[in-house]
């Protein structure tokens, strides 16, 4: 007679074993109708799974985040069901849940077109509208193997052969004539899978290995109701308008080409953005007392072996040979910074030593994963390493946290999610060391008034870390900043300092990044601002336009005044109508558009309007320059107002 304890503490006793669905029905028909699955003693279970002992139960519906994730997973099965009806010869690989949706990898000789995606969407809708029941059957490994062998599903057979023990009892989910294998849980009825949309198709290697066959991956999104689906699709539409690749081309910021995959060709205006971003971070380095250094781009393999990177990152490193020596282009800056630290004897009085670099790094990312500025092979890290004593860890981490928040606030990012990753199962050091280091990070976060989530066991083997994830205007998450303690690398590379008692000690190393990759962060900013950069960051801050040729000399005079005061200004003296010029520079997202005619020339003024069409009226040249320079010095996010 199981006793079921519900989240509110109430208990229900049953004479026989029950399922989550049975308990929901006992509570009321409305809950039974809405029940998707259950969390039994902390573990997700199908609504049909039997509970035969006293248990704690949470009933999951589409209102729960877990419920939405489950229905997305079931939509992947629905996609498989529809696919096999339209292309019976297709072989199904895997269909997991991803952020906001799902995908399925399929082996099919026919290359899918948009018309095929539309046909799949239609068939999925038809199937879901029948509200058919999903039947879960748990059986032996051999039953599952025979089932998929009879259906010619070679990828499912491979998963069984290589990833599932013959002692296990895999769950098969029957969607009418279609059968799929999964850990589950899944919806009990397809009535829950009504609000979905197939989004795109792409190539994907089986198991992510380029030596394997290229499959076709169909992506989809699914939500609990029509309203949520519509909101998401509207957000995607806005994201498409803000796509940094599209805006980058429109504004002539950069380009990429096949001869240098994952490498950026910065154009004049894009490079201006890059340099301004670098200048800003360099000022922050000065405020927080960092040394700026520059390490070599390439180092001998021997050093990477000593640091431990060769064992872990060799496949991602570009290498070359010269004079019988093998070199690797650096994928990260930390080993080089330890080499700089090791030059000359260091005392405890020299610590903390804060070392920063705009390090140009290269990683051999898979070609299929490259994505504009967001995922590249050549990138610049705003990387820093703090060498300190263990007693200094908390204060140094606290300073790093302040620097991260100061920086993000300048760009308007205020929704920051912070996660603390703690000791993994395989790690160096004793528990006492980990207790101290984790406590130091916790105290630093608490001292800065920062709420954080703990990720147990997610730290690196050499130390715990803090991750900073910012959310943009479309509520997308971007993990950028990290503060990572490292108790291993300094020792591996022989870093020591003379302690107060004259003993040789190994410093603690703090890895610190704020933006992460400058290229990626610029991609984020392009999309966050939709190309409308704040005045201080904008490649061109002011454009001055004449109405007739009579004002040409005056335009030159105005532009020169602006340039002398440090404002990035240009002129447009083309023999075009002023309305045409204004429209063109508005599309270029120049913050301020200045028009001069005879009256402005005679009065030594400029007529000012913003790229958003706000007319600020006439101003004296010096007054406008003063206001703009104040905006720039404050790094204001807003334009001048009327």
UniProtKB/Swiss-Prot annotation:
Entries under PANTHER family matching the protein: THREONINE--TRNA LIGASE, CHLOROPLASTIC_MITOCHONDRIAL 2 (PTHR11451:SF44), THREONINE-TRNA LIGASE (PTHR11451)
Cofactor(s) for this UniProt protein: Zn(2+)
Cellular component GO terms held in the UniProt record: cytosol
Function (record text): Catalyzes the attachment of threonine to tRNA(Thr) in a two-step reaction: L-threonine is first activated by ATP to form Thr-AMP and then transferred to the acceptor end of tRNA(Thr). Also edits incorrectly charged L-seryl-tRNA(Thr).
This protein's UniProt keywords: Aminoacyl-tRNA synthetase, ATP-binding, Cytoplasm, Ligase, Metal-binding, Nucleotide-binding, Protein biosynthesis, RNA-binding, tRNA-binding, Zinc
Annotated source species: Shewanella sediminis (strain HAW-EB3)
Organism lineage: Bacteria, Pseudomonadati, Pseudomonadota, Gammaproteobacteria, Alteromonadales
Family annotation (SUPFAM superfamilies): Class II aaRS ABD-related, Class II aaRS and biotin synthetases, TGS-like, ThrRS/AlaRS common domain
Tree of life domain: Bacteria
Cofactor: how and how many bound: Binds 1 zinc ion per subunit.
Coiled coil: none
Any matching Pfam family: tRNA_SAD
Catalytic activity: tRNA(Thr) + L-threonine + ATP = L-threonyl-tRNA(Thr) + AMP + diphosphate + H(+)
UniProt family annotation: Belongs to the class-II aminoacyl-tRNA synthetase family.
Record-listed Zn(2+) binding positions: 334, 385, 511
Molecular function GO labels: ATP binding; metal ion binding; threonine-tRNA ligase activity; tRNA binding
Protein name: Threonine--tRNA ligase
Localization per record: Cytoplasm
InterPro entries assigned to the protein according to its UniProt record, in alphabetical order: aa-tRNA-synt_IIb, aa-tRNA-synth_II, aa-tRNA-synth_II/BPL/LPL, Anticodon-bd, Anticodon-bd_dom_sf, Beta-grasp_dom_sf, TGS, TGS-like
A single BP term in Gene Ontology: threonyl-tRNA aminoacylation
E.C. designation(s): 6.1.1.3
Region of interest called Catalytic, as start-end residue ranges on this chain: 243-534
Residues in TGS domain copies: 1-61
Subunit structure: Homodimer.
């Amino acid at each position: 007679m199981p006793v079921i304890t519900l989240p509110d503490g109430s208990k229900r006793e049953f004479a026989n074993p029950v399922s989550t669905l049975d308990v929901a029905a006992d509570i009321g028909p409305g809950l039974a109708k809405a029940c998707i699955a259950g969390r039994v003693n902390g573990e997700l279970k199908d609504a049909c799974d039997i509970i035969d002992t006293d248990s704690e139960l949470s009933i999951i519906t589409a209102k729960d985040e877990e419920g939405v994730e489950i229905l997305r997973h079931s939509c992947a099965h629905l996609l498989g069901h529809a696919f096999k009806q339209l292309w019976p010869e297709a072989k199904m690989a895997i269909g997991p849940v991803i952020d906001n949706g799902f995908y399925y990898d399929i082996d099919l000789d026919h290359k899918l077109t948009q018309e095929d995606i539309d046909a799949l969407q239609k068939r999925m809708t038809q199937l879901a509208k029948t509200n058919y029941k999903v039947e879960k059957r748990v059986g032996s490994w051999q039953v599952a193997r025979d089932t998929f062998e009879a259906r010619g599903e070679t990828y499912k057979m491979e998963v069984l052969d290589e990833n599932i023990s013959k002692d296990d009892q895999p769950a098969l989910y029957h969607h009418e004539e279609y059968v799929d294998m999964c850990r589950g849980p899944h919806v009990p009825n397809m009535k829950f899978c009504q609000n979905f949309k197939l989004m795109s198709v792409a190539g994907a290697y089986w198991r992510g290995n380029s030596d394997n066959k290229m499959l076709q991956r169909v992506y989809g999104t699914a939500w609990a109701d029509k309203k949520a689906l519509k909101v998401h699709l509207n957000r995607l539409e806005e994201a498409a308008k803000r796509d940094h690749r599209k805006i980058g081309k429109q504004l002539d910021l950069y380009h990429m080409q096949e001869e240098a995959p994952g490498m950026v060709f910065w154009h004049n205006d894009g490079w201006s953005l890059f340099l301004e971003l670098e200048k800003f971070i360099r000022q922050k380095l000065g405020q927080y007392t960092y040394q700026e250094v520059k390490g070599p781009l390439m180092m001998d393999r021997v050093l990477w072996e000593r640091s431990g990177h060769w064992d872990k990152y060799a496949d991602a490193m570009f290498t070359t040979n010269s004079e019988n020596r093998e070199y690797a282009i650096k994928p990260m800056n930390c080993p080089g910074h330890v080499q700089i630290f090791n030059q000359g004897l260091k005392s405890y009085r020299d610590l903390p030593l804060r070392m920063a670099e705009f390090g140009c790094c290269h990683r051999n990312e898979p070609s299929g994963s490259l994505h504009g500025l967001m995922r590249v092979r050549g990138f610049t890290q705003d990387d820093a390493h703090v060498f300190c004593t263990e007693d200094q860890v908390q204060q140094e981490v606290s300073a790093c946290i302040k620097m991260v928040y100061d920086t993000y606030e300048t760009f308007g990012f205020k929704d920051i999610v912070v996660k603390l990753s703690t000791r993994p199962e395989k790690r160096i050091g004793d528990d006492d060391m980990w207790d101290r280091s984790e406590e130091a990070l916790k105290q630093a976060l608490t001292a800065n008034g920062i709420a954080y989530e703990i990720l147990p066991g997610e730290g690196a083997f050499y130390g715990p870390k803090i991750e900073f994830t910012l959310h943009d205007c479309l509520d997308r998450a971007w993990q950028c900043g990290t503060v990572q303690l490292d108790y291993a690398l300094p020792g591996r590379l022989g870093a020591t300092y003379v302690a107060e008692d004259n003993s040789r000690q190994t410093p603690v190393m703090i890895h610190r990044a704020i933006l992460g990759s400058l290229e990626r962060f610029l991609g984020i900013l392009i999309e966050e601002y939709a190309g409308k950069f704040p005045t201080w960051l904008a490649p061109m801050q002011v454009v001055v336009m004449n109405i007739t040729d009579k004002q040409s000399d005056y335009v030159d005079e105005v532009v020169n005044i602006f340039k002398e005061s440090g404002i990035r200004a240009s002129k447009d003296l083309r023999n075009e109508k002023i309305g045409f010029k204004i429209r063109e520079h508005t599309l270029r997202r120049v913050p301020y558009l200045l028009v001069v005619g005879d009256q402005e020339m005679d009065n030594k003024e400029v007529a000012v309007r913003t790229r958003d069409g706000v007319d600020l009226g006439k101003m004296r040249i010096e007054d406008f320059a003063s206001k703009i320079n104040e905006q720039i010095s404050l790094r204001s996010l807003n334009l001048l107002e009327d």
